[in-house]
Design a protein with these regions (language model features):
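Acidic, divalent-metal-coordinating active-site segment for phosphoryl/phosphodiester hydrolysis
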Residues: 128-139
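Conserved non-catalytic scaffold segment of RNase H-like nuclease domains
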Residues: 1-78, 82, 109-112, 117-127
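Acidic two-metal-ion nuclease catalytic site recognized across multiple nuclease folds
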Residues: 117-118, 137-156
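Short alpha-helix plus adjacent loop in nuclease-associated cores
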Residues: 89-107
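Generic recognition of well-ordered alpha-helical segments
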Residues: 94-97, 115, 139
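Acidic active-site catalytic centers that drive phospho-/nucleotidyl reactions
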Residues: 68, 90, 132
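Short hydrophobic/aromatic-enriched beta-strand-loop microsegments
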Residues: 82-89
């Protein structure tokens, strides 16, 4: 939860959701979440209601947020009949707009680790939803007041 220039850690949302199908071995390796960890997880409907209560009407800040919103919207559509209506803020787009380029075609590396490194933000444990949210919040706070770069030599 971001308020002003602070990340409020006492207001976090972190739950496990019972999967509706078998978890792929690759997913277990990446996320370090085993089937036994999910045995006491919430059913998807309960998890969605709790998530919506936590989010409220606030904007959602994320890294490649369209993917997350698409997954959440699949369930909000199923359970309450609408897609997730919240405004979204994409930190990779914020970062991109701050990078000075010598041409409109110059490559800007938008990998999460690259953004963290270039903004001098510590990398916490990866593929952990809470750590990812904290790092994404730090990126947002670092960039929210940065003026977009004049991107090319054609720009005044």
């Amino acid at each position: 939860h971001i308020k002003g220039n602070k990340i409020l850690m006492r207001k976090t949302f972190y739950v496990f959701v019972k999967p509706s199908k078998h978890i792929a071995e690759e997913s277990i390796k990446i996320h370090q979440i085993r089937p036994i960890d999910l045995e006491n997880g919430l059913d998807p409907q309960n998890a969605i209601y709790q998530l919506l209560d936590f989010i409220g009407s606030r904007p959602i800040v994320g890294y490649y947020i369209k993917f997350d919103v698409a997954i959440i919207s699949k369930y909000t559509k199923k359970f309450i009949g609408i897609k997730l209506p919240n405004e979204t803020i994409e930190v990779s787009s914020m970062y991109y707009k701050t990078r000075k380029r010598s041409s409109d075609y110059e490559f800007i590396d938008l990998k999460f680790d690259t953004i963290l490194k270039n903004l001098n933000i510590p990398a916490l444990g990866k593929h952990d939803a809470l750590n990812d949210a904290i790092m994404t919040s730090m990126i947002f706070l670092k960039l929210k007041d940065v003026t977009p770069a004049k991107t090319t030599f054609y720009t005044n």
